[in-house]
């Protein structure tokens, strides 16, 4: 990890003039969210993106001026130069013409995390961190707080199904946001409540070693405001170890988790315990103890990992002082986030009668395992059907690093189709294809490098009442509706 890539973590930051903000890559999940909040605060917002998308239309509708394609003149979309340019250093090359123009004009260039840090100022900050589950947990916390009447501001890495947005400028004191660790961005924030859902090695293309990756969460815990609280998941070894070390260092840390996990970590004070959970027709029913009070929830999204995320969301709202019963009621109304076990439809009649198609963002072995276990629970509860997955690995480095782990996780399905690797910001690596995963798998699997042929491959192996999942962080999401259409005939 290069020191020049780590954000400024001092308590004081240079003043940033946000009167006119230009965002490079404004169509991304993170960038579009901060753009919405800037617009809601009456700021002038311009931006550019490599291609047009459904994200840009609502931003334009509320006043953003957006160009498709990158060019130096895009900095003048508002008729004058911006006061600051915002970029993602991981995704935007340094020779981008808008970045080059900004430097020539001596316009400050900052990261999205710096901008979000500015937007968080003056609020009670709830930051959700962890290798997995950030978006779902953040979304659950937002929905629960809204039900409790707190109207929080929020910035999420995915679109809330019910609200239809990924960001909002609220009237309440709280601001709930994801704290992205992939490039150490989470060290820009000073939370009152810092949630860590789990920690296991990832993003080693940036951090280089697992030790450096774990250290960023230690440093995040040190960023708490005076009187703030670190909230850790005791079911996860990495998060539990962070909590134990935090307690030993005098940091105010509390834990949440299942009964066995809570018992295994006695040095961490417990504020939320999952007493029981089971799959029911409506989703997952769970009973939790929140600081001595028993509450019941029914989550519409399946999986034990979602119950843990729900516990973190409830606990966050409780620590903010929200009414626990209203929080629980709101959580039961949570309908999910786009691309998190997102339901696309069910086939009625014909060869594939009862087969349902879902899409999920899972792109790490642990995430894949959790989603497939949730799908298996749903199939088992129905008493029929199988689990079929179309998986697109994300990043050559991650695929090579975790090939065996991916194979083990994907083998929890009954059959699989593997697409070619979605490289994103990485260049192809000679000899690294999805076959490094398929060669290790123990279930029927086909390697299909032809993207457009995947729906036909799925139709060859799917059957009635099956759950079919498209999975990955890349373009595979576009296949879910195509697969559903193919199965419907």
Swiss-Prot record:
Reaction catalysis annotation: UDP-N-acetyl-alpha-D-muramate + L-alanine + ATP = UDP-N-acetyl-alpha-D-muramoyl-L-alanine + ADP + phosphate + H(+)
Q: Look up the EC number in the record and give it.
A: 6.3.2.8
What task does this protein carry out? Cell wall formation.
Where does it localize?
Cytoplasm
Q: Which organism is it from?
A: Corynebacterium efficiens (strain DSM 44549 / YS-314 / AJ 12310 / JCM 11189 / NBRC 100395)
Q: In terms of one coarse class, where is the protein primarily found? A: cytoplasm
UniProt keywords (A-Z) are: ATP-binding, Cell cycle, Cell division, Cell shape, Cell wall biogenesis/degradation, Cytoplasm, Ligase, Nucleotide-binding, Peptidoglycan synthesis
**Superkingdom assignment:** Bacteria
Q: Which NCBIfam families match?
A: murC
Pfam families, alphabetized:
Mur_ligase (PF01225), Mur_ligase_C (PF02875), Mur_ligase_M (PF08245)
The record's listing under SUPFAM superfamilies reads:
MurCD N-terminal domain, MurD-like peptide ligases, catalytic domain, MurD-like peptide ligases, peptide-binding domain
Spell out the family assignment given in the record's similarity comment.
Belongs to the MurCDEF family.
What pathway, per the record?
Cell wall biogenesis; peptidoglycan biosynthesis
Q: Which GO terms describe its biological process?
A: cell division; cell wall organization; peptidoglycan biosynthetic process; regulation of cell shape
Q: Which InterPro entries match?
A: Mur-like_cat_sf, Mur_ligase_C, Mur_ligase_C_dom_sf, Mur_ligase_cen, Mur_ligase_N, MurCDEF_pg_biosynth, UDP-N-AcMur_Ala_ligase_MurC
Annotated Gene Ontology cellular components are: cytoplasm
Full protein name: UDP-N-acetylmuramate--L-alanine ligase
**Positions contributing to ATP binding:** 130-136
List GO molecular-function terms, semicolon-separated: ATP binding; UDP-N-acetylmuramate-L-alanine ligase activity
